[in-house]
Regions:
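Sec-dependent N-terminal signal peptides
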Residues: 10-19
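Bacterial Sec-dependent signal peptides at the C-terminal "C-region" and cleavage site
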Residues: 18-26
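Acidic/histidine-rich, surface-exposed loop or edge segments in extracytoplasmic proteins
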Residues: 38-45, 100-105
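Active-site SXXK
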Residues: 36-37, 48-74, 152
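Positively charged n-region of N-terminal signal peptides that target proteins for export
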Residues: 2-10
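A glycine-rich, coil/turn loop motif that links secondary-structure elements
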Residues: 45-50, 80-84, 138-146
Length: 255
């Protein structure tokens, strides 16, 4: 297995050079076999860096672990009919599929406020032994939301345990029903921020992207291939195309 793993690392190095030669800084790449519990390929996996909207997976974990009513409607001040109300489950879909920052904030406010939610997120990170992880807000906009690839694999596997997160984050698109001020019902379809890969690969079970200037282009996934489960973490990419190409090569040639 060691020889096989070494060959995969060589292949990944070539892929990294080809796909990311224009990157200004080092990129984090981690592919971990969850089923057999061993790393396959790694690069900069202990580097602490901003994680952008990958943060929202922890926001979702805190929401679901709280046991709060997902069918209750709460205020939402986002792009879909500002000052309207949606159920927490609808907002959870918007947060994980579209990566809607206002949905994350609305969920936090409805639980106990943003400060309380961030406190619970950090508390859960410590409980999961994610000691290099720190959350500063619920959406990931803050550059102070930081983690490592190793920690994010822990968070991914914890998120996978929740049916809601698996079902929602694996949706390529979500249909939201909205009612305007004249009581007219409309349906708005939003695409998953990882829709290109999800449309091509049916092995993706959990998925979340993230993008900020500080974090670069980020992607975390759990995929299932040939009877085994893998975590894929890519942080600090220069372009979404680079990250997508790297993820494609990992899914097709590495695992």
């Amino acid at each position: 297995m060691a020889r096989h793993t070494k060959m995969k690392k060589i292949i990944l190095s070539l892929i990294l050079f080809t796909c990311l030669s224009a990157s200004a800084g080092a990129i984090t790449v981690y592919t971990y076999n969850i089923t057999k519990q061993y790393p396959i390929v790694d690069a900069e996996i202990d580097t602490v860096r901003p994680i952008a909207s990958i943060t929202k997976l922890m926001t979702a974990l805190v929401l679901l672990e709280s046991g709060i009513d997902l069918n209750e409607k709460v205020p939402y001040k986002g792009m879909f009919y500002s000052h309207s109300k949606f159920t927490r489950e609808e907002l959870l879909n918007l947060m994980l599929v579209k990566s809607d920052n206002r949905a994350a904030e609305a969920l936090a406010e409805s639980m106990g406020g943003k400060l309380w939610t961030v406190y619970q997120m950090n508390k859960r990170a410590i409980m999961l032994q994610m000691y290099d992880t720190k959350f500063d807000d619920v959406s990931g906009l803050s550059a102070k939301n930081i983690s490592t690839a190793k920690d994010l694999v822990i968070m991914l596997t914890d998120a996978y345990k929740h049916d809601k997160i698996r079902d929602i984050s694996a949706l390529s698109r979500y249909d939201l029903k909205v009612v305007d001020k004249k009581n007219r019902e409309k349906h708005i379809q939003v695409n998953n921020t990882n829709v290109k890969l999800m449309n091509k690969y049916d092995i993706i079970e959990v998925s979340k992207t993230g993008t900020t200037n500080a974090a670069g282009k980020c992607l975390v996934m759990i995929v299932h291939k040939n009877g085994e489960q893998y975590a894929i973490v890519i942080l600090g990419g220069t372009t979404r195309a680079d990250v997508d190409n790297l993820a494609k090569n990992i899914m097709e040639k590495i695992i």
